[in-house]
């Protein structure tokens, strides 16, 4: 019923041009589904007095672990609600960002980046929500404003990403493991194609034009290509779907339940304090507690449990229990640039009216999903370019056949937190005149800039401090400018010119003191238009045996604590040369 209402109302309101009303209705429907799931989850789940294992988080890694773990006496905890069927429609991705299905984290103000964003903050990805309070025992705990695309639902961030399946190369991981045997086991995941649910997605003329232009510049078909997506019959297929399809639902699963603290007994992780349905409950595990709460969530949970840098914990009023200096450190993220940088002379038939047209909807639900743009995950082509470093690739290019002006400024500009003045000066004229913009993002795969995550207070419900230190390395800025220069070469090739692709000639606000197209101008542009690609890693770094340099050993056991593991993207010592979702699966394996 919700799906029928969704498409019928969307079709009506977008056809008559009421973008804001259409997005508002979509938001209301997702909220109704959210609260329906929440009310359903309020029915008490019978819980065992003790479990073999408790998995904290049902995202990419957590759901994979749950589907593979041999024990049946397992509890899976999820802070958000269960997902709904509309989440399986890939094109609805932007509508989920900034909703109750998203943690909505926000970074600290960035001195060297995000100059075009409000308060120089990067939203990961979406806007503020009103403070609310929940009753937990005798306490009133505020939920502070936060934003960042980090999935808060069964399926985790895999529900909110572009579904690109990256087949990693061994060269990316050679320094991660102390023993060659451990690296061999890790690489088996990719070499044996343990994740088989991948398909080529919907594409427009733009993706083909960029790929063909790259061929003319001498790049190979293994460098620019249409990516594989984690879909099944055109629908989003996550590790949570896989978990359920394998019949592992014998495990207990508790949603809308936030872990407050890990309780240690003589150095052994035995208990969790969890807020669920307005109550504080205690859960016990006899063999292990596995943190799979993500790069922000896992580090934050360790810190608020007293596991982390002693002095920093004491500063915010948390009693240190295990001194692990590297918890929350080593934060790395893929960043890109280039929204509304390219204009296109031809329509790609991705106007909202085209998307919700009955024939397009019918194709998706009748099995002709590859002909329906509803199966489109956002990215229709990728490219990988080496700048001469030791890595396989230094830059990635993501080809997106739309821009921030595609919805008339109703929703997308809020996702990236654009300043109102910047929108009115640079973006709104494109929207007002009907010019079409597309996006080809140069993305820095191995940034030198490194940040950290910390606690704001001893209150576990307060949003964490997230400071990625974007573009504090001048080398990062230079490499992104090189990416823009490569993009200029691509747009000058015949396949791109036939589509009418050209660079936006309007100087970007705040950069007009520099000559347009000079390196100094593009350096200013990169520092202004700085986009997270939503791939943070590294805050619970794994590796060697020294607790001073890493958080866990290569077998994912937290140093100084028995029966406590971290198994998600937070353990990655460095960023892979591509989208890390598949790497998180391999960590779970």
Predicted features along the sequence, with ranges:
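N-terminal redox-cofactor-binding region of secreted/periplasmic oxidoreductases
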Residues: 2-589
